């Protein structure tokens, strides 16, 4: 199966925070925000072959909603930093000639990603894209 030529790599907690505001105090509410974000991403991926999405969260695995695994990959960093995994994925994807857009507001991460030839997109702008039909 051919991979799409564009990958949106999303700095998970950073993007969810940018879209939904400060993280709630309880894990249950944090998970609800993440689930809402993942569900919207999944809905957006249905019916298109133009891109894939990789969503990277800090921390250990948590239950997530069912997703279209051919188009949406959810990664938990475990003990590593999400930023390190994101940069590793950018380098790998660029090496294989894919176009990469990083969705983040983290300016340090964005600067490093630009050095690797990734494009940067603000999470609010990305949310506006996925909130309307393709």
Where are these regions (language model features)?
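Nuclease catalytic cores that cleave nucleic-acid phosphodiester bonds
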Residues: 2-8, 14-134
